[in-house]
Amino acid sequence: MTKIAGLGDESYGYIAGQGSGCIINAIMASTDAGKKMVESELTEDIVNSDEFANAFKTTAKLDQANGSEHTTDDNGNLMAEFNTNGKVGVLFNGVWNASGIDASLTDAIEPALFPGNIAIASAGGGLAVANNMSDEKTELALEFIKYMTSAEVQEKIFTGVQANPCNTTVDLNALAEQSGDAATMKLAKACAQVNEADTIVIDMKYTWGSDVNKAIINALMECAVSGTDIDARFEALQKELLALIG
């Protein structure tokens, strides 16, 4: 952030707020204990843990230094400043955003993992088969899952949707070269980084819940305001989270 601010051209470090949730996620995943916490349901012990306190306060200090004007609860609100204007150094937005990059910035933008070679990767709700169906329906459901995860469909996930396919047999580099699109080639590089990361952790909103995720992001957005007492705001957040989990 210091180097970018030193450019003196109104550039800034990163899009905070929604993106700050990713920073907490990655900091938690940097230790075995923290990673286990993120991958399980939120409990009172986790809320009161040193790992969570360190992750929140470290992120809050970064957000405060980055500036409250660069904070949003939806990255889409500031997306153009990364994809089109090139005003922001880092966008925490996953591998799927390649199609939004302006052609003039394609050469300048590079994918990267979090420090410690950590990647956040989730399949969202994923694909599941309901219980208590007939054998015939279960067989059809499994056939559908087999099709959806096939190379044929997953190639389209990469080239059309521009997301990281779940089928690791798909040759992303070959597809990217075949497309001839520079942004798609960067997408292939980003997917490879995620798939080969030393630590791959789930997005905490899928384990801790969207309400908890929103509460954490709101607290961080408040901490981004200069002069906010981070310790006091964290204590308030702990009470909010304990109320949410019952």
Residue spans for each PLM region:
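Extracytoplasmic/periplasmic solute-binding protein
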Residues: 1-44, 88
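Pocket-flanking alpha-helical
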Residues: 1-11, 80, 97-104, 242
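Glycine-centered hinge/linker elements that transmit conformational signals in sensory
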Residues: 2-3, 41-72
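Long, aromatic- and glycine/proline-rich binding clefts that accommodate carbohydrate-like moieties
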Residues: 159-218, 222
